[in-house]
């Protein structure tokens, strides 16, 4: 899932019943994080590195 601000998305995961599987890390020109939603679905979150 492409997002504009990965930090904001990750900060909202746990308070809303989800889990951070992998904290944000740099992958080429992207920031990537893996999260699990409250239903157990694993999702990749991506943000383009702008600088």
Segments and roles (model prediction):
Residues 2-4:
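Short hydrophobic/aromatic beta-strand micro-patches
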Residues 10-51:
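Vicinal oxygen chelate
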